[in-house]
UniProtKB/Swiss-Prot annotation:
InterPro entries: Ribosom_uL1_bac-type, Ribosomal_uL1, Ribosomal_uL1-like, Ribosomal_uL1/biogenesis, Ribosomal_uL1_3-a/b-sand, Ribosomal_uL1_CS. GO terms for biological process: regulation of translation; translation. Belongs to the universal ribosomal protein uL1 family. One of its GO terms (cellular component) is cytosolic large ribosomal subunit. This is Large ribosomal subunit protein uL1.
Length: 231
């Protein structure tokens, strides 16, 4: 039998694992149960009514959370000429081509997101085995391969999150930090749900948004009443 930690025991009585909570109440409980000494991330798991084994039902995309994520993203951009200058002006932390590729091959990757202009993919394509496993490979489906590198950089800096359904049909994402006001977390979750709804595969049948649960980095998952999410 699994032993409960002291912290988990303290949550007992506060959270009913079988109950569907209105979103505001669920987030309030998550914040209350987030007792770590650091500003815990507030995360969401959304169960979708899709068959993740089918290639035409893979849900993937990106959305700019209206209230940000609470984390400053470091952005690297593969671009040259005018596009490189646009990326720098938009706030990119690192801009380059072969020199940036050499950094990455040497294991020097001081960034969280990689963006590439289309003509830079000849260089980026050689880095697939390094960037791919880390979830950093640029992809047009999430807006990280684009001729408009400036907008992509601004979106990344403004709190854009990428999402992709896993093998179990669940999308995991952060929606902010414990220090965020509940209404800001609600706004971010509503934006994510709206993006997921718009990304619904045409071949998906039946109920699409099946379950939603919110949690903190070190806390318990709390199920949310879908009717309380205003997207």
């Amino acid at each position: 039998m699994t032993q409960l930690t002291k912290k988990q025991k303290s949550f007992q009585g506060k959270v009913d694992s079988n109950k569907l909570y209105p979103l505001a109440d669920a987030l309030g409980l998550v914040k209350e149960c987030a007792t770590a000494k650091f500003d815990e991330s507030i995360d969401v798991a959304v169960q979708l009514g899709i068959d993740a084994k089918k290639s035409d039902q893979v849900v993937r995309g990106a959305v700019v959370l209206p209230n940000g994520t609470g984390k400053t993203k470091r952005v690297a951009v593969f671009a040259q000429g005018a596009k490189a200058e646009e990326a720098k002006a938009a706030g990119a932390d690192i801009v380059g081509m072969d020199d940036l590729a050499a950094m990455i091959k040497a294991g020097d990757m001081p960034f969280d997101i990689v963006i590439a202009a289309p003509d830079a993919m000849r260089v980026v394509g050689t880095l697939g085995q390094i960037l791919g496993p880390r979830g950093l490979m640029p992809n047009p489906k999430v807006g990280t391969v684009t001729p408009d590198v400036a907008t992509a950089v601004k979106n990344a800096k403004a709190g854009q999150v990428q999402f992709r359904v896993d093998k179990a049909g669940i999308v995991h994402s952060t929606i902010g930090r414990r220090s965020f006001d509940t209404d800001k977390l609600q706004g971010n979750l509503a934006a994510l749900v709206d993006a997921l709804t718009k990304a619904k595969p045409a071949t998906s049948k039946g109920v699409y948004l099946k379950k939603v649960a919110v949690s903190s980095t070190m806390g318990v998952g709390i199920r949310v009443d879908l009717q309380s999410i205003a997207a």
